[in-house]
Amino acid sequence: MSKTHKAWRIHAHHDLRFEDVETPKPAPNGVLVAIEAGMVLSYMGRVMAGQVPYNLPPMPFVPGTNAIGRVIAAGENVGHVRSGDRVFLSPHLRGDVPSAEPPQILIGLTATSPTAEALALQARWRDGVFAQVAHWPAACITPLTLLDDKPATELIALAKLIVPFGGLQRTGLRGGETIIVNGATGYFGSGAVMLAVAMGAGRVVAVGRKPEVLESLRDRFGPRVIPAIVSGDAGKDLAIIRHAAGGSARVALDLLGSAKSTSTTLSCLRALKRGGRLVLMGSAEVPLELSMREMLANDWEVVGQFMYERQAPAQLAALVAEGLLDLRHVQVTTFKLADFERAVDSAALMQGLDLTAVVS
């Protein structure tokens, strides 16, 4: 193992450097991984410019959240992976403390709150995946034993799908049911449509404003996908969504990104049957105004979901291994690690089932 490796590091906003860094030995609960492919978030450029209100790791740090790689070495307390294993790296780390609200971070990106516990956890695991080698907490590593025959450029699609997978699990979607997906033409929303079909939904109401993208989802995933083209007119949108759902939707997942209005979100809620559940994973920039009278009269649930449960990556990988989910539907554009800055520009243009990755 080389004593140094190449990595991109953020030293300050607008100060990104590609440099040689020391290759560490794995901590007792850590794993050293050779990165094969790392996902580039669509808003990574804004993060690096300081335009997103995140609690960034202490600088300098290596950015980047999810990746596919191979284990170089595992710490002495790690038993579920060993050298040579193909693995999925998740950035979602919870502090292992006896607390009702344990600290949470997204490695290489942000702490969910600026508490002393969260910032200490982030300082310990600050570096992400845009490097030749990553040192990762074992708790955030999932072995991909049954998927070792697939290329990293295909497996990196797991990184795009894991967030909506967590949301779909929170909805409690059951086989044969109808689900409404709001923001279906977006980066995560399109993945939710793909996943809902794989998870056995009887009907997936794909809500969005881009007819061509919605039609492409139906063409790709079949007649169970029902496009619902909305305009922002609350009354008309509600009628369109209800009609597409056939009046039978019990659950909905909202993945609308950076929305200036919650009108469509409310239309999706109102399209649910009595006792329905709406799961929020989007990033609306305005409050969601709920009517207590409506909520009580309809026994609705509105819940937030941050990321996914710890076992979710293994469950998602199992869908692929069993042939229920074909990752090749995700359209991956790759760049060499040295071309990371070009990859960031490309990622900003992604929509639908696109994904940008850097490969080593």
Model regions and ranges:
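C-terminal hydrophobic helical "lid"/dimerization subdomain
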Residues: S2-K3, G166, K236, L266, ...
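Glycine-rich beta-strand-centered segment in the early N-terminal region that forms part
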Residues: P24-M39, V52-I105
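NAD(P)H dinucleotide-binding glycine-rich loop of Rossmann-like/cofactor-binding domains
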Residues: R94-I179
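Mid-domain Rossmann-like dinucleotide-binding core that forms the NAD(H)/NADP(H) cofactor-binding site
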Residues: C140, T145-D233
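Glycine-rich cofactor phosphate-binding loops and adjacent beta1-alpha1 units
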Residues: V197-V205, L214-D299
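Rossmann-fold dehydrogenase core element
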Residues: R277-V279, L290-H329
